[in-house]
């Protein structure tokens, strides 16, 4: 249907590798790169288009993560995928997301890696430690009832994709403290798109991991020299050490999520006009305990927690529900914890 960037009939083919989980084979965490590239004219399929950073870097990272993590056994399944047709309209992602929905796959989330190899920005800044995590605030698939509830109980920045972004931020700071993950409160860059979006459109969690500083002279450009500027997405401009770091960011987060128990479901919260906050949630198979998190309403990260075991309800005494946001994560016997679940229901007084 897209006649603007699809000028003739073509097959859209993704390359997919699935590492099946030992306990939850139908629960998937996904890492993706893209296997297409482009030059200045998106319909020019004849000119040399190396796409070294956009997006051979993300694809190489995905393959390397698969090489390393395939040596281990995880409770949840991991999908490593090269998505096609990104530059022409996110076709590969649309196809896989639709397939996952139709087959009833339980998608924990997708980590879309699109450009993870550039450290020198068009603004002249050089930075080999900072990277961005883009995420939408709430699912586009939420119902009018869910949207209305947020007006009264909060959650405007606490959708499933934002929780995945917070998990990646926290895990990176824990295992790679030299890195500087930066959460960006946008679906993607201003007016632009990436292959996590089709998964968001189907109601799945999805984020984009990418370099902090883009260089537009090396992105979507015909290879040429003009006004003393070398244009083109060439291999010489990719910083391999930086791409390695962001690949490691993906690997530690894939492993942490794949080793963790499922996130709590049916999390309910109460505490209106009380000096305490109450919680109830469904028991999670394989969880040793649970972390109850809270944060200031203006804080981007979960900053405080208390740990509980052998219960599916708890009250935080001396805390007023109005002044904080709350969430609950499952903790496995191995110490790995799930992504935080934001409350979706109320405990009636």
Describe these PLM feature segments.
Residues 1-48, 67:
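Soluble metallo-hydrolase cores and metallopeptidase-like ectodomains found primarily
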Residues 67-91:
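Short helix-loop-beta-strand segments that form the rim/entrance of peptidase-like active sites
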Residues 83-194:
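Metal-dependent peptidase/peptidase-like ectodomains
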Residues 116-136, 183-259:
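Active-site-adjacent mobile loop/cap segments within catalytic or ligand-binding domains
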Residues 275-286:
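Conserved aromatic anchor
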Residues 304-311:
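Short beta-strand segments within Ig-like beta-sandwich modules, predominantly Fibronectin type-III
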Residues 316-337:
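Beta-strand-rich modules
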Residues 333-349:
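Extracellular fibronectin type III
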């Amino acid at each position: 249907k897209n006649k603007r960037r699809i000028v003739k009939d073509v097959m859209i083919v993704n390359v997919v590798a699935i590492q099946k989980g030992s306990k939850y084979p139908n629960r998937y965490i996904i890492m993706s790169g893209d296997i297409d590239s482009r030059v200045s004219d998106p319909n020019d399929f004849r000119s040399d288009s190396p796409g070294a950073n956009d997006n051979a870097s993300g694809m190489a990272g995905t393959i390397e993560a698969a090489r390393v993590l395939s040596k281990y056994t995880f409770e949840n399944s991991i999908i490593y995928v090269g998505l096609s047709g990104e530059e022409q309209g996110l076709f590969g992602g649309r196809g896989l997301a639709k397939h996952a929905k139709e087959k009833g796959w339980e998608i924990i989330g997708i980590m879309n890696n699109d450009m993870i190899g550039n450290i020198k920005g068009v603004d002249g800044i050089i930075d080999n430690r900072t990277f961005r995590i883009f995420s939408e605030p709430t699912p586009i698939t939420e119902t009018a009832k869910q949207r209305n509830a947020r007006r009264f109980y909060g959650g405007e920045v606490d959708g499933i994709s934002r929780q995945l972004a917070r998990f990646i931020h926290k895990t990176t700071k824990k295992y790679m403290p030299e890195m500087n993950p930066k959460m960006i409160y946008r679906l993607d860059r201003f007016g632009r798109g990436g292959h996590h979006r089709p998964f968001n459109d189907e109601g799945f969690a999805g984020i984009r991991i990418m370099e902090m500083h883009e260089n537009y002279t090396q992105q979507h450009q015909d290879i040429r020299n003009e006004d003393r500027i070398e244009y083109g997405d060439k291999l010489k401009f990719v910083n391999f050490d930086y791409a390695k770091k962001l690949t490691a960011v993906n690997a530690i987060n894939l492993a942490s999520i794949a080793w963790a128990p499922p996130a709590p479901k049916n999390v309910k919260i109460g505490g209106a006009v009380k000096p305490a906050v109450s919680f109830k949630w469904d028991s999670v198979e394989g969880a040793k305990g649970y972390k109850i998190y809270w944060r200031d309403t203006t804080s981007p990260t979960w900053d405080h927690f208390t740990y509980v075991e052998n219960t599916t309800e708890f009250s935080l005494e001396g805390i007023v529900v109005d002044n904080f946001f709350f969430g609950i994560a499952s903790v496995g016997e191995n110490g790995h914890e799930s992504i935080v679940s934001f409350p979706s229901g109320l405990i009636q007084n």
